[in-house]
Amino acid sequence: MITGKLITVEGPDGAGKTTVLEQLIPLLKQKVAQEILTTREPGGVAISEYIRELILDINHTTMDPKTELLLYIAARRQHLVEKVLPALEAGQLVFIDRFIDSSVAYQGAGRGLIKADIQWLNEFATDGLEPDLTLYFDVPSEIGLARINANQQREVNRLDLETIEIHQRVRKGYLALAKEHPKRIVTIDATKPLKEVVSVALEHVLTLLLA
């Protein structure tokens, strides 16, 4: 039985969601006694991390969009049963850096795959599990890509080779999801100063936990 809460963190490349999460968790630990788990997709467990390497390998430029989607779905399933569900059943507060919405935005809006197919695969992999809250960090594609290019410590992966048009479609996909699920997905302006973005995210999380 699930007694914990699931919060997912989403955003286009360069939105800074991972950085926000790194700063958010220590602040949250000062305010709640609940045990907190942070993890990521694809990855989080050994099998899923191996799949992550396959997906991001810069040499795999011939990967078909459906192959890419199925790899993400496989990684999601293993991560869920091995790490996420046990934590939720133990009453923990679980944060996942990317989850089901990423597939709809990237492989759906970005790659042009049929949304209904992606939603079915998501439901198949998760047994219908949905986040209690999704923090969507929004940033224009031009700004996001500029941030990526300015980060010299970031290792280039296959997805960094995509055109700006694909990144723009991904963002539109996310914004459409936010309109479709207004109660679950909150949109946060990620162009604001980091401290302000973290503060807004913290407020939304605390609102969920205190409801």
UniProtKB/Swiss-Prot annotation:
GO terms for biological process: dTDP biosynthetic process; dTTP biosynthetic process; dUDP biosynthetic process. Coiled coil: none annotated. Pfam families: Thymidylate_kin (PF02223). ATP binds at residues 11-18. It comes from the Bacteria. InterPro entries: P-loop_NTPase, Thymidylate_kin-like_dom, Thymidylate_kinase. Its EC number is 2.7.4.9. Keywords: ATP-binding, Kinase, Nucleotide biosynthesis, Nucleotide-binding, Transferase. One of its GO terms (cellular component) is cytosol. One of its GO terms (molecular function) is dTMP kinase activity. It catalyses: dTMP + ATP = dTDP + ADP. The keyword Hydrolase does not apply. Phosphorylation of dTMP to form dTDP in both de novo and salvage pathways of dTTP synthesis. Belongs to the thymidylate kinase family. This is Thymidylate kinase. It comes from Streptococcus pyogenes serotype M3 (strain ATCC BAA-595 / MGAS315). The gene is tmk.
